[in-house]
Amino acid sequence: MITILGAGGGIGSELAKLLIDRKQPFRLVSRSPGAVPGATETVSADITDQGQTIRAVAGSRIVHLLVGLKYDHRLWAEMWPRVMANAIEACKRAQARLVFFDNVYMYGKVNGPMVEETPFSPCSKKGEIRASIANAS
């Protein structure tokens, strides 16, 4: 089973379409998931709650973490560490691979191409938060 945490956003919607086209079974997880023709399952869960996250991920082999939070660095500082910890713990228990779609805030201003080895050099609070999460994971 492929699970999409944060299925209500633009990236989750596009991934769901791709999985439908490929006839892959998948589970959509969000606080209030809508019916999606072709989705194997829909699950309502608050992934800031560890128990709900563990239940939502149970039985998965791949979990896509595509959650979006309100664009506020104070909220990010409070919620992202919890969301990430819950997703990692749930994937460990399910023995699932975690795919995290991240942004580039942690890199700051980069001259030239960005590659996997590009060092973190955040230039904002949001960037510092994302770098700390990436370094802790």
Task: Provide a role label for each language-model segment.
Residues 5, 29, 66-67, 100-103:
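SDR active-site strand-loop-helix element
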Residues 2-3, 73-75, 120-124:
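Short, contiguous strand/loop micro-motifs
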Residues 24-31:
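Conserved glycine-rich Rossmann-like NAD(P)H-binding loop of the short-chain dehydrogenase/reductase
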Residues 25, 85-132:
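Conserved Rossmann-fold NAD(P)-dependent oxidoreductase catalytic core, especially the SDR/UDP-sugar
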Residues 34-94, 107:
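NAD(P)H-binding glycine-rich loop region in Rossmannoid oxidoreductase-like domains
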Residues 2-24:
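N-terminal Rossmann NAD(P)H-binding glycine-rich loop of SDR-like oxidoreductase domains
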Residues 17-21, 89, 135:
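Short, well-ordered alpha-helices that flank and scaffold nucleotide-derived cofactor binding pockets
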